[in-house]
């Protein structure tokens, strides 16, 4: 099955400041990134906080389609349970990200710490911003 990405086109009114989104905005701007793939647990990819929050600042945020999101959730859980990412999961994720690169993606936003070993095993050259590391800067 070919990995496919979709663009999140939803918009919501600005509901005030979100320190995490602002920290991500600053990191993405500093890295010169405008079009990114958001990867994480289901709640991160499906929820509006990061997608819509970054879109309000002019970033184009892509997320995998629902089937790929469900697969990624399972891959994260398997890597946590087994202590290392499965080779097939690493290859699948690398293909998903490579497809994003073919569609102009400039970098990755990782929304959860548990995803870092899986992405790290892909050996990618795309820049990444780890949202979970910015949590402490929310205050």
Question: Where do the protein language model's features map onto the residues?
Answer:
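Non-catalytic structural scaffold of enzyme domains
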Residues: 1-139
